[in-house]
Amino acid sequence: MSQRGLVVCRFTLCLLLTGLSLLGAAGQNKSTREREFFSDRIPSDRLQQYADLAVQWSQKYFRIDTTNPPGNEMRGAVFFKEILDAEGIENRVFEYTPGRADLWARLPHTIEPARRPVVLLNHMDVVTSDPSHWKVPPFSGAIVDDYLYGRGAQDMKNEGIAHLLVTIMLRREKVPLDRDVIFLAVSDEEVDSTGTEWLIAHQRDLLGNAEFLINEGGMNIRDNTRVKYIGVDVGEKSPLWLHVVAHGRPGHGSVPLADSAPNRLIVALNRIRAYHPPIKLLPIVEEFLRAQAPNEPPARAAHFRNMRQAIWDKNFQRESERNETLNYLLHNTISITMLGGSAQTNVIPSEAWANLDVRLLPGEDPKQFLETLRRVVNDPNVTIEPQSSDFRPANYASTDTALYAAIRRVSAHYFPGTPVTPMLLSGTDENQIYRPLGIHAYGFNPYTATQEENDSEHGDDERIRVEELRRGFRVLYDVVTSVAAKK
């Protein structure tokens, strides 16, 4: 064989060996990718069984009426306890007042050294419903056209079942945990948060100095073809409820009085309505809007990509006041929610009143905002006072944590190409109560929903797609194992 032929042969052999090596590496990488998450280790038949349980347990749980008021969350606690007892999982029920209870359960870590626990928090109470406006009874647990209907289907019995199922899976699959995983179902979130407040006051040690908490508040909106974004609740606005009272001359309704209390109240409320709190751009809002830019018309998309410049644009400032979402994200907001005056049509009262629902951005001073409103009204015959002296300052969690990184990583796996972005809620949730305890608390929802499905929360025909129930628990399982399990 010629030297040239030998060289060619050696070159060909080299290429062959290199190719085989690359194929082996590719196969190894593929195998690694396929087993990147703990759910990949579960046989498909068992995943199918878990998916069946998700639907079955959801139907049973949705049939339990925990309307608040009065709550009766003890019914939900008993439902959870029966399942947890059957699985041999440590749990305790605390009936802190008749019919109202919290349930705590724990999977202890199995690996040392252990890190701080992760809490799965959900509330068992739901808001009221009017059955006459529903397609099916709100507590029937009925499946119609591939949707499971029920009060709590979006807020948040659906997530409570995901939390429960993940806890069960961790136990059954014998996942090696280097954190305690705590399942916590509480009462009265929809009204006064007495369940969480009681637990922290009387059983705080059961939280085990937790590092992370996953709660409601996340929002993952999809259209017919794709998931538009994965929204993680990292902060909420704080409610400042105000009582406005106008004083004036009383008299007979047949003789109009220019300086009557109702007239003074109307003038005061018109001044409040005309007042536009200035824009305040929070970093989490800036990141959220930037992620929304691809879904917006060109002009708005340009603003969302450069919000620090947009907030100085007069046209955008006006849009931020007109657009409901931009308004709550960028401003302190004021809603007139209640009005009162005379008990009789022909009596001009000496007092007329209104209630305002004010929502303040994180970092805002309630006393300063109250003084601003008093200056806006500028009438010594009109008083504005807080309805309660108990003001809970708004707070938010850092996105520079292992849990937030896990949410990003898992979401990229299940929803490739979809942005994961922090969110600021217009309302409030119990994350605000847990963050001051040193816990990184996030609202993360493992399910996706169309805007219409999401809007059924607290509305008529609240529902969730059955397919979401069968899929979402796996997303949460991989998030939890990413921060609590040892590979």
Regions found by a protein language model. Name each.
Residues 44-55, 69-77, 153-156, 258, ...:
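Solvent-exposed, acidic/flexible segments
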Residues 10-21:
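Bacterial N-terminal signal peptides
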Residues 1-8:
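N-terminal secretory signal peptides that target proteins for export/translocation
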Residues 25, 29-36, 219-228, 232-235, ...:
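Metal-dependent amide/peptide-bond hydrolase catalytic core
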Residues 67-69, 98-99, 111-113, 124-128, ...:
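Solvent-exposed loop/turn segments at secondary-structure junctions
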Residues 29-151, 170-179, 356:
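Acidic/His- and Gly-rich active-site-bordering loop/insert found
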Residues 52-60, 74, 78-82, 146, ...:
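Solvent-exposed, polar/charged alpha-helical surfaces in well-ordered, non-transmembrane soluble domains
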Residues 147-148, 154-231:
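Acidic/histidine-rich catalytic neighborhood of metal-dependent amide-processing enzymes
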